[in-house]
């Protein structure tokens, strides 16, 4: 009787090992099929969409009032760091320095594919290429109403 129990136990263990090997082989085939599907060249639009969630939280606007030409480089540095810059040139009395700083700012904006918008005679908004400047806002601010729906 003990031989019968031992042989049944052996058969039971051997059967489980055989099943395990077959399962392992079958799962290996599934992996190959999945790899072929992944490498088929077809992909969904959802898989191709890359979204950086940190860009909007890192947005900063810097206000600069340069007094000398050497401070123009700091404006370009802010643009390189993808920060929008409001430049106030009203404090400059020397028109040559004002013109030189303005030319430097225009060059920096051009090289970095940014944009520049005139706010007033001597105040400008410089934006890197990840920031859009809406020129319609100037028209809204020029109107007496604070909100567009107040113009009734």
UniProtKB/Swiss-Prot annotation:
Q: Where in the cell is it found?
A: Cytoplasm
The top of its lineage is:
Bacteria, Bacillati, Bacillota, Clostridia, Peptostreptococcales
User: Which UniProt keywords are given for this protein, alphabetically ordered?
Assistant: Cell cycle, Cell division, Cytoplasm, Septation
List where this protein forms a coiled coil. none
Which terms does the UniProt entry file under GO BP?
Answer: division septum assembly; FtsZ-dependent cytokinesis
Its name, as the record gives it, is: Cell division protein SepF
Q: Does the keyword Cell division apply?
A: yes
InterPro entries attached here?
Cell_div_SepF, Cell_div_SepF/SepF-rel, SepF-like_sf
- What's this protein's family per the entry? Belongs to the SepF family.
